[in-house]
UniProtKB/Swiss-Prot annotation:
Induction (UniProt): Expressed in the early phase of the viral replicative cycle.
Protein's recorded name: Poxin-Schlafen
Pfam families: B3R, SLFN_AlbA_2
Catalytic residue positions: 15 (proton donor), 136 (shared with catalytic histidine of dimeric partner), 140 (proton acceptor)
One Gene Ontology term of the molecular function aspect: nuclease activity
Source taxon at top rank: Viruses
GO biological process terms, semicolon-separated: symbiont-mediated suppression of host innate immune response
Site (Substrate binding) residue list: 58, 103, 147, 167, 180, 182, 184
Gene: OPG188
UniProt keyword annotations, A-Z: Early protein, Hydrolase, Nuclease
């Protein structure tokens, strides 16, 4: 068994290596090829990664083999040999390289009581003395100068990682070098998941939410928080209270450390939660009165049903049936909406015989705001219809009085509106669980609205009909992020987001 230190898995009773505790002491130097999720990766020759854990005031560092992988792997993902035996788990990465943790090459195991440890990239051509690096002549003069001082107790260790050689130096309080170890191997340092956020500024809550989501979905990391205001800790805690839904009390761990001018939010996730940390799912459902965005657990339930059923079949056509006056059930409203949708013309001020329902939404807007409102509202409204039972959107019918108002535009502007609608519908992401993988089916009409006595008109009601979709329709990509191999935050696509759900 292997337990990631990033997830709180350190156990002093088990074998400990950089990044993991395990029930077996596996010599990872003997492997030339490894497998992750049945994909094979070659161990990089003559190049290593210096990895370390700092747990319970103990430092565990070593040069480890690494393999190249252009896909994003999660901390804790199992690593196997070619016979299918698990030999380690994913722990550290540098760009598109991942470490293979276990018994590695040169190592350093320290008690950190009273001493510090620092890591540096050793620049090509530089020499090292104690805690500084520079060109050789400068370092030589530095060493001569410090030799005159008496050595004192060691207070710091410095690990220097270079392309051709690695070194460990120790220094006393004056910076005098007390000890040096030299490893004739080239290595790299893993990229830490570190994000910097300023609070007390515009969009600070959004930036903080994005950072938390990305780090929790990438095994953990640290957010360095600064603020123009004096009480950075107070401002931070207020922001964290407003977005507490982003982390799970059961699965995620979050710790705030206060500094003088900044705070640090350390976090890691056990990856046992069925869902990724998500700010917004952008999955909508239609209710009688509104288009509601599903939260993560509602989305899990909805997507689980689609996965289990392999998608949905088209809805059967409505049966013809004469309803007595005044009946307002869902089917009668839908039938009236269908008749209204097929009208060739309308009269300004006429009353519509049906209101909003699970299948119908009315909205009115001025011609000036028409394209803006379509851009802002169309994706959520139409995707909610597609995810529920299908439905009708009528733009130009007053939501309160249910009277026809319309909007007045020229022919060229109408073409732009029609093009906008087509563009926004075609951009709606669909995640399929079925074999047919059909597109969203819809129809759009502009129904002319006449005033009494007018023979011509430039006033219209826009009528859009959307059928129930076979699978899940998103209004946009989910607002859920991860740290990529370059250390940048990337948003999951809908397909990627769904693929990470533990159904």
């Amino acid at each position: 068994m292997f337990y990631a230190h990033a997830f709180g898995g350190y156990d002093e009773n088990l074998h400990a290596f950089p990044g993991i505790s395990s029930t077996v002491a596996n010599d990872v130097r003997k492997y030339s090829v490894v497998s992750v999720y049945n994909k094979k990766y070659n161990i990089v020759k003559n190049k290593y990664m210096w990895c370390n854990s700092q747990v319970n005031k103990r430092y565990i560092g070593a040069l480890l083999p690494m393999f190249e992988c252009n896909e994003y792997l999660q901390i804790g993902d199992p690593i196997h040999d070619l016979e299918g035996n698990q030999i380690s788990i994913v722990t550290y990465r540098h760009k598109n390289y991942y470490a293979l943790s276990g018994i590695g090459y040169e190592s350093l195991d320290l008690c950190l009581e009273g001493v510090g440890i620092h890591h540096h990239v050793l620049e090509t051509g530089n020499a090292v003395y104690g805690k500084v690096q520079h060109e050789y002549s400068t370092i030589k003069e530095k060493a001569k100068e410090m030799n005159a001082l008496k050595p004192g107790p060691i207070i710091d260790y410095h690990v220097w990682i270079g392309d051709c050689v690695c070194q460990v130096t120790t220094v006393d309080v004056h910076g005098k070098e007390i000890m040096r170890m030299r490893f004739k191997r080239g290595a790299v340092l893993p990229i830490p998941n570190l994000v910097k956020v300023k609070v007390g500024e515009e969009n600070d809550t959004i930036n903080l939410s994005t950072s938390i989501s990305a780090l929790l979905n990438s095994g953990g990391g640290t957010i360095e928080v600064t603020s123009k205001e004096e009480r950075v800790d107070y401002v931070l805690m207020k922001r964290l209270e407003s977005i507490h839904h982003l982390w799970s009390v059961v699965y995620d761990h979050l710790n705030v450390v206060n500094g003088e001018e900044r705070c640090y939010v350390h976090m890691h996730s056990s990856h046992q939660s069925p869902m990724l940390s998500t700010v917004k799912t952008n999955l909508y459902m239609k209710t009688m009165g509104a288009c509601l965005q599903m939260d993560s657990m509602e989305a899990l339930e909805y997507l689980s049903e689609l996965k289990e059923s392999g998608g949905r079949s088209p809805r059967p056509e409505l049966q013809k049936f004469e309803y007595p006056d005044g009946v307002k059930d869902t089917e009668s409203i839908e039938r009236l909406a269908e008749e209204f949708f097929n009208r060739s013309e309308l009269q300004a001020g006429e009353s519509v015989k049906f209101g909003n329902s699970i299948n119908v939404k009315h909205t009115s807007v001025s011609a000036k705001q028409l394209r803006t409102r379509i851009r802002q509202q169309l994706p959520s409204i139409l995707s909610s219809f597609a995810n529920t039972k299908g439905g009708y959107l009528f733009i130009g019918v007053d939501n309160n009085t249910h009277k026809v108002i319309g909007f007045t535009v020229g022919h060229d502007y109408l073409k732009l509106v029609e093009s906008d609608i087509e563009k926004y519908i075609q951009k709606l992401p669909v995640v399929h669980f079925c074999k047919k993988k059909e597109d969203i089916k819809y129809a759009c009409r502009f129904i002319k609205v006449y005033k009494p006595g007018d023979e011509t008109t430039s006033t219209y009601v826009c009528a859009i009909k959307v059928e129930r979709c076979c699978c899940a329709v998103f209004a946009d990509w989910p607002e859920s992020w991860y740290m990529d191999t370059s250390g940048s935050m990337k948003k999951y696509s809908p397909d990627e987001w769904v693929s990470h759900i533990k159904f």
